[in-house]
């Protein structure tokens, strides 16, 4: 594959069912990018969060682009940020691409 492809980024709230069980996992999906050098940074209220992060290896798709996911898990007590952000850096992104949600919106 010759041309660079910008990733699409999606972020998902932890489910209410999971939060009620004592933990909260927020997922960031990074899809369809090339070349493979994408990185994910998690932020809570614009502060970098490094503990509880599990980022998958990138997976090569049939069209020779890559996809990956990153999951941030914390206890329900720690899930007190008002804004959660997944920030993706990639050679095609200047500046980095950030997707966020307000934790008050995570009611489903």
Swiss-Prot record:
Disulphide bridges? 13-106, 28-86
Tell me which domain of life the UniProt entry assigns to the organism this sequence originates from: Eukaryota
Keywords tagged on the record: Disulfide bond, Immunoglobulin domain
* Domain Ig-like, chain residue ranges per copy: 7-102
**Pfam families in alphabetical order:** C1-set (PF07654)
What name does UniProt use for this protein? Answer: Ig light chain C region
